[in-house]
């Protein structure tokens, strides 16, 4: 962190040089396959002097809190994809359990004591090497902030509805450095993004799409809106009922736009890109999520829903029973 802070000192005067130095430094110290592949790709992209990612980086460094960028980035890159990945691979090697590098939690914010309900899950996750969590609530996201604060070594991605992003929420979120807020794409997204930008918080937008709602993504209008909102990332997530062909077309468009550096924002597919990172860290990748009642979203190899509940079973036992290498092969 000290090295990164030192490198960021000249960010305001020369963001391009600062970015190149950070990428070169990261590539020099990177050890894992994921790190090396990621930073080699980043350096290749930044060799393009006209890359739209340069003005994106400059805007991000000027308008988002640097301590938040450092903490979230270190938690994601080091704790999650380096230190955590080492634990994930060790458990696979010694216990034959396929541990995901990230998992999703859909949380009902109306519960009176979220800490006692969920902290054990984060503790179990970290023991298994999981330091990256994607949290979603369709209720009040401010209720989740104490949970996020209590896990400062984790990178927390908090997905919420735009109407829930208020001045009070943004003010409460200012004290947290380990969180990126994902704002749902709807009629109020622009207002929510302006609030978060005013408070120098880390944010981006995400969109869940169906077969009939992919046109805006494929045409680029969704990404151009994200540019206007000054979002570092523009994420998509397929609805469970979305057809495989539409998912594949959207992912091809996401990767194509990212590689071509088409927009002043970085397109991400929350399913396929997470799966791809998982396959680099420890193949075969598993994407796991839990509903508000604790039941698991995942489908078994026989096509039937898995009957696990995170509130009744330990995470290790769930993974051992349904996500062991023998079980998946």
What are these regions (language model features)?
Residues 28-105:
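N-terminal [4Fe-4S]-dependent radical SAM core
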Residues 144-146, 168-170, 247, 301:
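A short acidic (Asp/Glu
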